[in-house]
């Protein structure tokens, strides 16, 4: 029996041949229970990357309580500010996701509106997932222990209906 020399074996890359799978829209949104944890900063950095690389992206500022100069709609002119806690705002958001040509939607969700946001997700998820939309929830862990609890609460509420990306922002 001979052993293959692993250094000479090239990894086989699987290519997505299903265009429908490759063209699926995705909603990337922030999760968290409190403000000031860096969610908007992270999302704006991600938006900067997409725009610099000329990757089409739709930005949505759903953090209606953040009226300061640090909100997503202030940082990126033309970004709609939508209250997803209302039926009209929810319809507006779903319409934007499905009608916009951009494959990716970056949504900055408000802190402190966790239960309302979960209700929003419950209403939105079924109709959007039927359209093939994928979801990515971004959470940030800081030195504040409540950020860890918030991420676990979100995971408990959203379960396996989303993918998760958690950043460790502790020093």
Go through the PLM ranges and name each one.
Residues 23-29, 43, 52-121, 132:
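Nucleotide-state-sensitive switch-loop elements of NTP-binding domains
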Residues 1-29, 92-95:
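Extreme N-terminal, non-catalytic leader segments
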Residues 36, 66, 146:
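Flexible, glycine-rich phosphate/dinucleotide-binding loops
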Residues 112-171:
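Conserved catalytic-core segment of NTP-binding enzymes
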Residues 30, 50, 59, 137, ...:
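Generic structural hydrophobic/aromatic packing signal, biased to beta-strands
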Residues 14-50:
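Walker A (P-loop) phosphate-binding motif
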């Amino acid at each position: 029996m001979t052993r293959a020399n692993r250094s000479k074996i090239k990894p086989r890359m699987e290519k997505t041949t299903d265009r429908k799978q490759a063209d699926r829209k995705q909603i990337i949104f922030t999760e968290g229970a409190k403000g000031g944890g860096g969610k908007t900063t992270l999302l704006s950095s991600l938006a900067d990357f997409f725009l610099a690389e000329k990757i089409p992206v739709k930005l949505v500022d759903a953090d209606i309580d953040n009226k300061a100069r640090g909100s997503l709609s202030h940082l990126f002119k033309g970004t709609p500010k939508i209250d997803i806690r209302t039926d009209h705002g929810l319809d507006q958001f779903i319409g934007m996701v499905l009608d916009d040509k951009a494959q990716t939607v970056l949504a900055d969700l408000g802190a402190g509106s966790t239960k309302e946001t979960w209700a929003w997700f419950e209403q939105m998820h079924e109709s959007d997932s039927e359209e093939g939309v994928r979801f990515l929830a971004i959470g940030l862990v800081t030195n504040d222990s409540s950020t860890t609890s918030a991420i676990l609460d979100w995971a408990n509420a959203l379960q396996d209906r989303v993918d998760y990306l958690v950043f460790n922002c502790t020093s």
